[in-house]
Design a protein with these regions (language model features):
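Amphipathic alpha-helical segments enriched in hydrophobic/aromatic and basic residues
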Residues: 31-32, 82, 93
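Beta-hairpin "wing" of winged helix-turn-helix
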Residues: 62-79, 84
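Amphipathic alpha-helical dimerization/coiled-coil segments
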Residues: 2, 88-120
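Basic amphipathic alpha-helical segments that dock to polyanions
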Residues: 54-61
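N-terminal helix-turn-helix DNA-binding core of bacterial DNA-binding proteins
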Residues: 10-53
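Intrinsically disordered, low-complexity serine/threonine- and proline-rich regulatory segments
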Residues: 1-14, 96
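Amphipathic alpha-helical recognition patches that constitute DNA-binding helices
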Residues: 15, 19, 80, 84, ...
């Protein structure tokens, strides 16, 4: 039976926070539901987030001072908490994104050379 969506991806520990920071950096202030939907869209539906997962990340990021929150009105006229990246969060995003790129490059090199050696 064909699938409309790619296989679901289980996020590695800590990667959701990176995705939330990146989403807020790219799109500006958003409410939790909007952040979750944007991550799902950007991942091609490979990452599906429930409310508990996204809000746990938002609380954690707010406690660390990487995002701020304030109440506002959503598109459908409901009260919603909007989250925004702080200057500290911007610095953390840059650090985590660089760390992620370094780790994935190393893993890529190892996977590209399954027989060991220098690859030369």
């Amino acid at each position: 039976m064909p699938h409309d969506h790619p296989a679901r991806v289980d996020l590695l520990q800590g990667t959701l926070d990176l995705l939330v920071l990146q989403t807020l950096d790219a799109l500006g202030p958003l409410h939790g539901f909007g952040i979750a939907r944007r991550i799902e869209q950007a991942s091609g539906q490979a990452v599906l987030l429930n409310q508990g997962t996204i809000y746990a990340s938002l609380v954690r990021l707010q406690q660390r001072g990487w995002i701020s929150a304030e109440w506002g009105t959503s598109d459908n006229n409901r009260r919603a908490k909007y989250y925004a990246l702080t200057k500290t969060g911007q610095k953390q995003l840059e650090k985590e994104a660089n760390d992620w790129r370094r780790v994935t490059a190393v893993i890529g090199r190892v996977l590209a050379n399954p027989h060991g050696g220098s690859g030369q």
